[in-house]
Each structure stands twice: as structure tokens, then as C-alpha cells.
Amino acid sequence: MTAAGFNSILCLRQLVRLNRRQYSAPAKSVLSGSQTNDQATPPPTSKSADKMRGWQLHNYGDIDELQLSEMLKIPQIRCSNECLVRIRATAVNPIDLAMLRGYGATVLNKMRCQPGDGIEFPLILGREFCGELVQTGMGVSLPLGSRVWGVVPLQATIGSHAEYVAVPSYCLAPAPKELDDYEAASVLYAGLTAWSGLYITGGLGGPCGATTASGGGAHKRVLVLGGSGGVGTLAIQILKSQKVQVLATCSENAIEMVRNLGADLVVDYNNPQAMEELCKYAPYDIVLDCAGQGGQKAAESKYDFRQYITFSSPLLANIDKQGLGVGALKNVFDLFQTNVRSVTQRGGLVKWGFFSPAPQGIQFLQKLVEQRKLMPLIDSSYGFSELPKAFEKMKSGHLRGKIVVKLREETGD
């Protein structure tokens, strides 16, 4: 990121912080006292204290299916590596909107094989958070009271759109001091999606890039489609931190913002003449589709590439529509057919990228934040009682960064 771009992002950050203060109402404390040991014993001491607020889903459908419940049971730790977190801030991601409509239900229900996880409803959405560690299993070394950031596995029935969440210890880490609660709650889901696509699926840094926090990819050339969204903005910063040449597409009114993130060339995807410029830099080592175009569009590109990685795969949708067996076969056929066209016309492979809650990915992102090479962009912020409005904002599209939701006041730790 350039110095001028970094200063511009800092100015935007200050404006967002000023605008969000009206939503910062403290939530009630439901834990009495503090726990000094690391064993998973029930934290509350009264019947009223073991309850929490959360947004539940009892049927798949539209945003009006979300219901705020005031007396939900706080999740219990069931394994030695689990952690209970009191949430201060969370975020709304495209996957939340998709899961609200039933996306991935067939596969995710099969994955809910632990006792108590096999029930589909009620479902609490939310994939990432920043909060306070209030209880741990005996195998967790993080101290209680730690400020942490983390993600929630997709198959979990209790997500982060509630006051408390329980997750495996590999899904969280100490939150960077460089970020406030809002910012820390907005990094990991999109950041791990971008990191996984580039380093696990794309092999950008070789074997070490996928298995460690080393990163890599210097002097490669990557085209980011949809550079102004949650995944795109973080992908650009990740790539530039590793000395990768980055080109990006976005709408005309987001060009300056994306350029400030460090992209070497930014073009308006609605301008055919500008899009022609991308052909001059081909072939690309990776085309990273953060715009939801899907692999079918790869062969229609006017530029060559070695890999086209899309986060909009039909994998879960095919299984939802046709069942596990037939859907799996349909996935194999779709990927094969897409790659035949892609290799024939553009010379490269199409791959599907996915979110991965890998601890080495969290460590990599944490390192970039601490080095001030990665800063999340906040599109808008909402209070917890306004979560449906946050979903409406997500549904409207054309975001400039992430949508965040605040549950608690910051404590300055």
C-alpha cells in the first residue's frame, strides 16, 4: 500500500469511527464474576445469568425470517480444545445471506455429526467476531480475559450473531492491538477466504505458502476481479505485501479507493475500452474471481491465464438441488467441462476456492496487520438490534468493504 493510499485509508477509518459511535450501546453482562481456571465449568451462577441474546433462524427464506431472541442458552464447551467467547463485534458476509436462503444445507447438515449438532433449526448465522475469552477447555493455553478475533466453522449451528459463541481454539487468536473491535471483527472470514484461494488453491507461495504463515509470490502477476468488496480489498493488500503485481477491476466510483490499496492498475469493469487494457498484461499467473462471476465465465475472458480461481463454485448448490450422490457427480462434470473450455480457449485451469479456518492463515493475516500492511475497510456499521438492516445492506450489493455489527463497548484492553 502506498503512503498516500495508507493516509487516505486512515482518514476513511476515522470518519467511519465517528459515524458508528451512535450505535455503541453496552450489552448486559450475563457472566457473574470471573473464572480463574481453564476447565469447562458453567460460568453463570443464576438461572437468569445463563441466557444470551441472539438472532435465530427457524426456516430458510428471506431476511424477515431472522428473529431476535432474548433468552437463549449460552453455548457450552464440550471439548478440551473449545473456547467460549463473549462477542463485542461481528460482521455480515455474503455467505450469511446465502445460508439464510438455505445454501449448503445438505452438506452442512451431514457435517453436523457431533451430539447436539444434528438439529438443523434453530440456526444462528455469523462467521466471524472479535470478543473476550471467558471460558476454555483444559487443552487451551490462551488466558481468560484475552481479547480475541476468530471465525466460526460453516457447519456450526450457533454462529457469531449472538452474544456468545463457542469455537475450537484453532479458529481464534489474540486480536491485533492495531485494530479496534469493529475492524478486528471484519478481517478473518474474508481474509482467510482470500488467503486460502491464493495459497492453498492457487499455490502462490509454493508448499510453504499453504502450510505456513510465510506467504510468498513475489514478482507474480494476479488479476483481482471485484477489488472493492470484502474479499477483494483484503486480497489486494495481501498480494501487494508479498510484492506481487496486482491488477484489479471494480466500478468507476471505487477506482480511487482500490488504487489506494496499492493495486498497480485498476479498471472499470463497465468500460469495454478500459477492460481491453487487461489483455496487455496477460498471461496472468492467477485470476482471482471475487466478483461472483463463476468458472463458466473463465473461457469467455479476453486474456490468457494459468489459473482462474473463483469463490462462486456450484459445489454446494448442485448438492442442494440434486442430492449428495448425483450432485457430487454433477460437480465433477461441471468442473471437467469448464476446464476443457478454459484450457482450450485461454490456456489455464479453473479452480474453486473456499474459506478455510486454517491457523497458519490467521497467523499470516495477524502478521500483516501488525506490520501495517493490511487494514480492513468498513462499508457500514449497525447496532445489534439492527442486524436485519445489515442484511438488507448486504443484499443491496456494491459494497466498499465490510458490514459490521457492534454488541459491546470497547474496554481499552
Swiss-Prot record:
CDD domains: RTN4I1. SUPFAM superfamilies: GroES-like, NAD(P)-binding Rossmann-fold domains. Transmembrane segments: none annotated. The keyword Translocase does not apply. Keywords: Mitochondrion, NADP, Nucleotide-binding, Oxidoreductase, Transit peptide, Ubiquinone biosynthesis. It catalyses: a quinone + NADH + H(+) = a quinol + NAD(+); a quinone + NADPH + H(+) = a quinol + NADP(+). It is found in: Mitochondrion matrix. NADPH binds at S228, G230, V231, S251, Y269, G353, F355, H398, R400. This is NAD(P)H oxidoreductase RTN4IP1, mitochondrial. It comes from Drosophila melanogaster (Fruit fly). The lineage of its organism: Eukaryota, Metazoa, Ecdysozoa, Arthropoda, Hexapoda. The gene is Rtn4ip1.
